[in-house]
């Protein structure tokens, strides 16, 4: 088999079928207007002390999860923060839970990613100010004590992590009594209050973190929850936005599916939440011009050496034929076909990929059209 890099002038196959999990492998190609909307929205939240709910809408495979992971990268966020002249955001990506206790699962997903040792180190020089601030938010003395314990280096970080997880038995709980923690966390109100308080502390005066960015991916799964859990999920979103009035940017990634469409949205996302949506970012199906721009940029990012043809190893007429054959489909479907076409050509040592090559594999690479 011929050397892939030398033959196809590509570092590797650029057509991913699923979003990368390694941040170093995440790149953005084309779709400049969508990228710009995210950059501007995040930059506004970095600059301005207000909380915002954004709905990201599109079909399966349109790039919502990819956007969440890319804009969760520290180097991307650092660049946006430097542009705004502020500190970096605290960002995390979770998926909407489908189990019996969605709020507890959301809470655990966020606590899983909370590095208490790192947090304490970051806030060590302003912990006194943070404690004073905690006294000013809400009236629940228990929640205030828990929040202070998170930032208190005198308490073992693993002990407070056990407590937050609910893994501390009554005997060990006694060790936290002196810090004002007299009971375990027990219900959705506790979990929501802890998260709201934590987010507010993280962004105190925008000194250490300019804002908290929370992405909830696969939000369309709300359609498979029972009515009680749909209520709980909507209440959580409403309460977290109300209780973190400053510096929270919440993205909901929603995929149009057989279970949920724009017309069905009101059945699952209540008016109390919809009324808080400040912006909708749509991931539309790409037209031929947008797709070809995306393809040129993507291939350029993976190019090994140079070539006068920006689509190489594909001839442009192959790209045009593929667009006609596939019709109006998602970016993922284009990527699937091009990935398979490239792999088959590599196996059979066919390069460049011209019309003859395309026609020989056409039945295999556009099987999903029917």
Functional labels for PLM-detected ranges:
Residues 1-14, 18, 173-321:
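The catalytic "switch" region of P-loop NTPases
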Residues 1-54, 74-82, 354-370:
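A short, basic N-terminal segment
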Residues 37, 66-71, 102-113, 233-236, ...:
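Alpha-helical scaffold elements adjacent to nucleotide-binding pockets in ATP/GTP-utilizing enzyme cores
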Residues 43-46, 72, 199-203, 224-227, ...:
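Alpha-helical repeat scaffolds in large eukaryotic proteins
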Residues 47-208, 331, 345-354, 359-369:
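P-loop NTPase nucleotide-binding core
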Residues 49, 230-233, 327, 334:
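Active-site-proximal structural scaffolding
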Residues 289-293, 298-370:
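C-terminal alpha-helical "lid" subdomain
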């Amino acid at each position: 088999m011929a050397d892939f890099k030398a033959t196809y002038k590509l570092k590797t196959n650029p057509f991913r079928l699923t979003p990368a999990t390694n941040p170093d492998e995440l790149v953005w190609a084309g779709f400049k207007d969508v990228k710009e909307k995210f950059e501007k929205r995040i930059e506004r939240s970095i600059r301005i002390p207000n909380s915002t709910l954004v709905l990201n809408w599109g079909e399966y495979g349109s790039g919502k999860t990819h956007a969440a992971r890319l804009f969760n990268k520290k180097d991307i966020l650092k660049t946006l923060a430097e542009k705004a002249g502020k500190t970096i955001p605290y960002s995390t990506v979770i998926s909407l839970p489908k189990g019996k206790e969605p709020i507890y699962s959301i809470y655990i997903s966020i606590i899983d990613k909370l590095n208490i040792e790192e947090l304490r180190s970051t806030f060590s020089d302003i912990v006194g100010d943070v404690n004073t601030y905690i006294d000013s938010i809400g009236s629940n003395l228990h929640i205030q004590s828990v929040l202070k314990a998170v930032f208190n280096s005198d308490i073992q970080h693993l002990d407070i992590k056990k407590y937050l997880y609910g893994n501390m038995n009554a005997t060990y709980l006694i060790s936290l009594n002196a810090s004002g923690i007299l009971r375990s966390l027990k219900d959705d109100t506790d979990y929501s209050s802890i998260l709201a308080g934590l987010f507010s502390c993280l962004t105190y005066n925008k000194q250490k973190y300019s804002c908290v960015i929370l992405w909830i991916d696969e939000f369309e799964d709300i359609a498979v929850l029972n009515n009680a859990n749909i209520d709980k999920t909507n209440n959580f979103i409403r309460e977290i936005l109300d209780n973190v009035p400053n510096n929270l940017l919440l993205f909901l990634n929603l995929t149009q599916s057989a279970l949920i469409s724009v017309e069905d949205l009101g059945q699952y996302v209540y008016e109390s939440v919809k009324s808080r949506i400040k912006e909708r970012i749509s991931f539309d199906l790409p037209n031929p011009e947008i797709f070809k721009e995306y393809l040129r940029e993507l291939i350029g990012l993976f190019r090994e050496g140079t070539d006068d043809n920006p689509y190489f190893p594909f001839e442009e007429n192959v790209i045009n034929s593929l667009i006609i054959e596939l019709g109006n489909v998602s970016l993922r479907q284009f990527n699937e076909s091009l990935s398979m076409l490239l792999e088959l050509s590599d196996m059979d040592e066919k390069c460049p990929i011209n019309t003859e090559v395309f026609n020989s594999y056409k039945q295999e690479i556009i099987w999903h059209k029917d």
